[in-house]
Amino acid sequence: MSIRTERVASLLQQELGAILQKELPRSGPIITVVEVKITADLSIARAYVSIIGTPEEQQEAMALLQDKTKSIRKILSSKIRHHFRRIPELEFHEDHLYERANRIEQLLSGVRKSSAENV
C-alpha cells in the first residue's frame, strides 16, 4: 500500500468507527472497525469489523451494516468530502480474529493445565 492509501484507510477507519458508535442502536452487540483496506484507485473501501455478542447478534449486526451501507456512506461523505473528490464504495466484512485468538488462548490454557497435572 502506498502512503496515500494508508492515510485514507486510517482516516476512513476513524470516521467509520465514530459513525457506527453514534448511529447504530446501543442495545445491540459491540461493533468495532478493526481495519480498513482500500483499493489502489481509492474506489472501494473494505471495512473489517469485529462484533462482540452472541452468534445471532453478530448475524443481525452484519445484516444491519449491509442494509445501512448507503446511509453510512452518505454520513461519511458529509464528514470527509473536503478530503476527496469521490467517496469510496463501502463493503463491510466480519473479522473473526478476536474469536480465533480467544479459541487459541483456551487451547493453550488446556495444554498448560494438562502439562501441570502430568508433572
From Swiss-Prot:
Role summary: One of several proteins that assist in the late maturation steps of the functional core of the 30S ribosomal subunit. Associates with free 30S ribosomal subunits (but not with 30S subunits that are part of 70S ribosomes or polysomes). Required for efficient processing of 16S rRNA. May interact with the 5'-terminal helix region of 16S rRNA.
Annotated GO MF terms: ribosomal small subunit binding
PANTHER family: RIBOSOME-BINDING FACTOR A, CHLOROPLASTIC-RELATED (PTHR33515:SF1)
Region forming the signal peptide: none
Alphabetic keyword roster: Cytoplasm, Ribosome biogenesis
Keyword Cytoplasm: yes
SUPFAM superfamilies, per database record: Ribosome-binding factor A, RbfA
Similarity remark: Belongs to the RbfA family.
Protein name in the entry: Ribosome-binding factor A
Gene name in the database record: rbfA
A Gene Ontology biological process term: maturation of SSU-rRNA
Subunit structure: Monomer. Binds 30S ribosomal subunits, but not 50S ribosomal subunits or 70S ribosomes.
GO cellular component: cytosol
